[in-house]
Design a protein with these regions (language model features):
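Short, high-confidence coil segments that cap the C-terminus of an alpha-helix
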Residues: 72-75, 217-221
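Catalytic cores of nucleic-acid endonucleases
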Residues: 55-86
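Active-site/acyl-donor-binding loops of N-acyltransferases
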Residues: 224-300
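Short beta-strand-loop-alpha-helix junction that forms the active-site gateway
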Residues: 35-63, 175-177
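Short hydrophobic/aromatic beta-strand or adjacent loop that forms the aromatic wall/cage
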Residues: 27-28, 137-139, 288-293
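A conserved beta-strand-loop-helix scaffold within acyl/acetyltransferase catalytic domains
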Residues: 91, 95, 100-219, 225-233, ...
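Acidic-basic catalytic patches of nuclease active cores, encompassing PD-(D/E)XK
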Residues: 1-22
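Amphipathic, interaction-prone secondary-structure segments
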Residues: 22-37
Length: 301
């Protein structure tokens, strides 16, 4: 099988990007520039080869050290994990190009938010979110009324999207309730948000969040930013406050399908190898954890 770094390099070169392979803190990375040539970007491919939980933890710790090393000297690298690249290749290619400023654009003011059915949300998120669909209570879709942003001359999106196209989905959990004095606080989790991978929706997250708040009147909303992708700066811009971190999650990865399955705490043997049904021959990957954000809409302690 072709090495991950070779595949990504060949893909970018086929799209017209000049690439060089360099070393950063002991890791081989891809160096390129955004489409307009104004910004350099570093891509850190992470192959998945760990045969045990212990090895996966060591690889994760080393990769995180490399990410932090790069961040102190340059911009944060784009992290591409092997399972994502191979299992969701079309989405990952489009998302990578979008990070390099090759994307189409839409503005939230030219869109409308509507409640959608679970099946429609599931289908969209399965195709366009790295973790797919997760059980939730509220499903919202962002539908294009007209497109006035620029268009990317790459991949499938070479023409304007038709009015009425579903371009983003946001989902929220049911309420978690607790008592504060004589009040009942209702807290919700913003479970998923994804747009079409080669489309940047300016103001999309904010518009969908505002609709949910107006519909449901929550006291509190929390969400997680997966550190594989970002630190969650967009949440801060929306008014959320960083509250803490969620510990890294260990996954069992099927090398035939590249599907991730979380390994539940307490299911590992003494040597660190997960003891779970169907894990024989699987590889293991531990992510970097998540940043936890919260928006308080009601004043409570």
């Amino acid at each position: 099988m072709t090495r991950l770094i070779d595949e990504i390099t060949l893909f970018l070169e086929s799209e017209g990007f000049e690439c060089s392979r360099q070393m950063r803190d002991g890791a081989e990375v891809i160096c390129t520039r955004t489409l307009d040539g104004r910004h350099s970007r570093i891509i850190l491919p992470l192959e998945i080869s760990a045969a045990s939980a212990t090895q996966a933890a060591e690889v994760s710790d080393r990769a995180y050290e490399c990410v932090e090393f790069i961040r102190t000297l340059e911009d944060a690298p784009l992290i591409i994990t092997e399972d994502r690249w191979r299992a969701q290749e079309s989405m990952m290619r489009a998302r990578l190009l979008a990070h390099l400023e090759l994307f189409s654009q839409a503005f939230a003011r030219n869109c409308e938010v509507r409640r959608i059915e679970k099946a429609e949300a599931r289908d969209f998120l399965t195709r366009n979110h790295s973790y797919g669909y997760a059980a939730c209570r509220y499903h919202y879709g962002l539908f294009l009324k007209r497109q006035t942003g620029h268009l990317a001359a790459s991949l499938e999106n070479k023409e304007s999207l038709a009015p009425g196209t579903l371009i983003a989905v946001a989902t929220f959990s049911n309420a978690r309730k607790w008592s504060k004095g004589d009040r009942v606080i209702k807290s919700y989790e913003w479970t998923r948000y994804a747009s079409l991978p080669d489309l940047r929706v300016s103001g999309g997250m904010g518009k969908m969040l505002k609709t949910f708040i107006n519909d449901v009147r929550p006291d509190d909303i929390m969400s997680y930013a997966d550190l594989e992708w970002s630190r969650g700066d967009v949440y801060s811009r929306l008014g959320f406050v960083l509250e803490g971190q969620k510990e890294p999650v260990l996954f069992s990865v099927d090398p035939r399908t590249w599907e991730r399955t979380p390994v539940k705490p307490g299911t590992t043997a003494g040597d660190g190898g997960p003891v779970i049904p169907g894990s024989a021959g699987n590889l293991f990957f531990r992510n970097f954890g998540s940043n936890k954000y919260r928006m308080k809409l009601t004043d409570y302690e």
